[in-house]
Amino acid sequence: MHPSRSGGLSLALTLDMHKKARSGGDIPQGIVVTARREASLAEMRRALRAIGFAIPIEHRLAPTPVGSDAAVVALPDTSEVVNATGLGKDRPGSPLTDACHWPARGLTWEFSYHGELAFVDQASAAAAAPSLTVHDGWVCFIHGPARVIAKVFDVDIPMSGPAFDALSRIAIHATS
C-alpha cells in the first residue's frame, strides 16, 4: 500500500504510478490518499477519474494528525508512507503525531529537503523498532536540477556514486 497526502506532489507521484501500471511496471496493491480538506480530495478524484486511474485508491479525509495516524496504522507491513504536505518545509509540523505506528519493514519518504522536517525526525525515531527505512527529499531535490543542467549544457552528470555524492555535498554547503 502507498499512502500519500493530496496536493501537487502527491498527484504527480500517483500519476507516475498510473503510468507504470499502464506499462506493466511494478506498482503498489493500492493507494491511500489523505487530506485535511475534502476539496483537495475531490480535486484529486476528478483528475484521476479523467485519466481512468488504474490502481485501487482510497481517499480519506484526515483533518488532524490523529486522523492521518489512523490511515498509517491500518497499512500492511512493507507499505510506503509519503509526506507531500509541505508540513515541515512550508510551515511547521508533521501530518502525523509522534505516537504514530509505522508499518513494519516499511519505507518513509519526505518530499521536503529543508526546514523543520518533523516527519523525518518522527520516522527516524521509530526506524529501529519496525525496521523502517527513512528517506528525505534531498536526493530527489538534487536529481531535478542535475538532469536539467546535464541537458542544457550537454554534459554527463552521474545520478549516483562518488561524483553525485560530491555534487550533493557542494549543494548542501551552498544552501546552508
Descriptions of predicted regions:
Residues M1-R22, A35-E38:
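Glycine-rich adenosine-cofactor-binding loop
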Residues G88-F164:
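Rossmann-fold NAD(P)-binding glycine/threonine-rich loop
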